[in-house]
Structures are given as structure tokens and as C-alpha cells.
């Protein structure tokens, strides 16, 4: 908005259905429906009010019809907007990617893709750094490549972004972000 830049990258909206531990990098939203309307009101993201969004949607018969189909009423509220956005985001599911098919034995990787997977999942060996893995899989495991935890990767000693600490106030959460 007006050239403003946020201080974090957007998280993936894929496979939110299986998220079990907060939303946003710092976990400040407990439920997806809460997360869905926060960017609307953020001055750097959409810089809008829910009241204005409701008013705009009420002026478009396409939306009033869709709200009637979804909720049995054409009464548009910010809560119903959050529910609609939540359902939409829960529908964005990855289940037929090449990786998914590879895991199911229905696809093969190229040599380069195999090397990438080895690099991702193999442990780092400080005695052979040129030939060891990047050790990503310890934290980014499972089908969604997420542990659902908040961790500090330890790269910084001073933090420009306090991460989870700003939500919990716990010193142990300083610099921690959702994995």
C-alpha cells in the first residue's frame, strides 16, 4: 500500500487444513478464520476496514447471491466473510504434486531432483561439508514439511524481528518462527 513494505514474506496458503498450531509466522492467530481477516485490516497489507469490505460486497449481487447459497441469508457480515475465506483456504490442498506422486510410487524423479531430495533429507556432516546434506528434513519433515513448532534457527544473535516472542512474551520464543 502506497509503497509500504512488510517485514515478512507471506506464508504458503497450501494445506492449511492440516495446520494445528497457529497461523502467521509468529502464530498470532489461533484460528484460520481469524487469520483470514487480519491482512484486510493491516495498514501495510490491504489497509481496509471490515465495515468497508462488507459494504462493498453488499453492493455486488454476485456476492449477496453467493452468501445466500453459503449461509442461507444474503446478510454479509465480517464473521461470515472470515468463515468463507477459511473454507476457501482449507480447499487449497496439494495432493498430486510430483513429490506426492513420487512418495506414492507413481512418479520418478530426475537425477537432479533425486540429488535435491538427498540434500534436503540427509544430515549435515561437518567433516565432509562438500558432500553432506543440508539437514532440512529434521525440522521440515512430514507430508507438509512442517513440524508445526516455533523455532529459532540460531542464525542471528540480535533480532530485527522478535517472532513468536511478540505473541507470548517468553524469552525462549525470541526470534522463533513457525516451521
Residue ranges and their predicted role:
Residues 6-12, 24-30, 42-48, 57, ...:
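Short, exposed beta-strand "edge-strand" segments with a Pro/Gly-rich flavor and a Y/T-containing core
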Amino acid at each position: 500500500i502506497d509503497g509500504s513494505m512488510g517485514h515478512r514474506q507471506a506464508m504458503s496458503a497450501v494445506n492449511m487444513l492440516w495446520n494445528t498450531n497457529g497461523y502467521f509466522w509468529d502464530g498470532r492467530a489461533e484460528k484460520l478464520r481469524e487469520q483470514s481477516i487480519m491482512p484486510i485490516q493491516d495498514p501495510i497489507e490491504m489497509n481496509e476496514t471490515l465495515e468497508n469490505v462488507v459494504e462493498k460486497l453488499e453492493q455486488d449481487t454476485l456476492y449477496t447471491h453467493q452468501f445466500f447459497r453459503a449461509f442461507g441469508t444474503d446478510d454479509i457480515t465480517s464473521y461470515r466473510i472470515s468463515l468463507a475465506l477459511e473454507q476457501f483456504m482449507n480447499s487449497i490442498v496439494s495432493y498430486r504434486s510430483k513429490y506426492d506422486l513420487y512418495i506414492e510410487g507413481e512418479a520418478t524423479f530426475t537425477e537432479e531432483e533425486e540429488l535435491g531430495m538427498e540434500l534436503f533429507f540427509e544430515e549435515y556432516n561437518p567433516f565432509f561439508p562438500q558432500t553432506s546434506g543440508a539437514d532440512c528434513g529434521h525440522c521440515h519433515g512430514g507430508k507438509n514439511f512442517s513440524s508445526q513448532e516455533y523455532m529459532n534457527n540460531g542464525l542471528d544473535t540480535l533480532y530485527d524481528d522478535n517472532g513468536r516472542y511478540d505473541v507470548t512474551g517468553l524469552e525462549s520464543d525470541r526470534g522463533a518462527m513457525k516451521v
